[in-house]
Amino acid sequence: MSPSLREGAQLRESKPAPCSFSIESILGLDQKKDCTTSVRPHRPWTDTCGDSEKGGNPPLHAPDLPSETSFPCPVDHPRPEERAPKYENYFSASETRSLKRELSWYRGRRPRTAFTQNQVEVLENVFRVNCYPGIDIREDLAQKLNLEEDRIQIWFQNRRAKMKRSRRESQFLMAKKPFNPDLLK
């Protein structure tokens, strides 16, 4: 075997020194499988529930795990229904609804806006004339309909999406119909 082939074989057999910026080290694949990490759960709602006295419900204080609690490295993320707190077992139905409302900010949701029939009629009439109203029109509508301008903007976005979806569905139904050669005559 030539000296250059021997050097190549030796390089292949020897493992390179581990780098701190290698993919394996970044992903933690170079660590042992039985490693444990110290994790403290993130529970921001335990700090903000103290403001609930004005709502009449007692605040919910979830117990914190000690910081020494360790979890195995390969973390299996629980399904959403497992991850949700099981407070239904501890509170009445009205308290549960109130608690869900208090914690809903954590999920990034705001309460759904219920438009009255009159508001929908006015918005539909404006939509027929202009489906892309400017800020001045939206602010004027907000003042007249006693709504927030951003709710009106979202209503128009949703209405345009509904119109686009219905057009697509009607085009699909037209294309789905069997071709009739008698129509060409």
Swiss-Prot record:
SMART domains listed in its UniProt record: HOX
Entry keyword Magnesium: no
DNA-binding residues (ranges): 108-167
Pfam families: Homeodomain
GO biological process: brain development; camera-type eye development; canonical Wnt signaling pathway; cellular response to cadmium ion; ERK1 and ERK2 cascade; forebrain development; forebrain morphogenesis; gene expression
GO terms, molecular function: chromatin binding; DNA-binding transcription repressor activity, RNA polymerase II-specific; protein homodimerization activity; RNA polymerase II cis-regulatory region sequence-specific DNA binding; RNA polymerase II transcription regulatory region sequence-specific DNA binding; sequence-specific DNA binding; sequence-specific double-stranded DNA binding
Location(s), subcellular: Nucleus
Entry's Gene Ontology cellular component terms: nucleus
Origin: domain of life: Eukaryota
Segments of this protein annotated with the region Disordered: 32-69
PANTHER family hit by this protein: HOMEOBOX EXPRESSED IN ES CELLS 1 (PTHR46966:SF1)
Role, per record: Required for the normal development of the forebrain, eyes and other anterior structures such as the olfactory placodes and pituitary gland. Possible transcriptional repressor. Binds to the palindromic PIII sequence, 5'-AGCTTGAGTCTAATTGAATTAACTGTAC-3'. HESX1 and PROP1 bind as heterodimers on this palindromic site, and, in vitro, HESX1 can antagonize PROP1 activation.
Protein name per the record: Homeobox expressed in ES cells 1
Species: Mus musculus
Gene: Hesx1
